[in-house]
Amino acid sequence: VIGLCMGLAGAIWAELPVPAFTLAWRHSIEKIRWEEDYRVAAEGLLLGEARVKGSGAGMEIPADAELHEGSWHYRRQLPPLQPLRLGRTPEAGDYQLCFDQRCHPMSDWLGPPQASQPALELWSCELGSPLSPVDKGQGDG
């Protein structure tokens, strides 16, 4: 079963059996909520729609974004992300993972953000497998 792994440098800190999720956060300066929808596929995380309530420093809304119900909606064409790299620090606040119509702070699985560990990676993985994004597809397969 393919699911979502969270960790760093191939070390798995948490696994979630979800086929899709929304990654949400508040811009560290503007305090504006951003959301990105992802599908979990064998080849990586596939970005779907993104939404934002307004622009923030260093994170401009694309020119083709459309305003619906107070949020800008847009899509970016990216190859599968394997892994998706995130900065995660106490100063910026935590990310949320939303699935099954509920949002959860990443600290539910990983503990609070720490200055000593300012990065996080998300990737699709075979649940219960020790394979990292680097060695995925190699081995006795």
Regions found by a protein language model. Give the residues of each.
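Residue-level detection of beta-strand-connecting loop/turn positions
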Residues: 8-10, 101
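N-terminal secretory signal peptides
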Residues: 11-62
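Compositionally biased, low-complexity repeat tracts
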Residues: 3, 54, 133-137
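A short beta-strand micro-motif
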Residues: 2-8, 23
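Mature, soluble, non-transmembrane domains
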Residues: 60-141
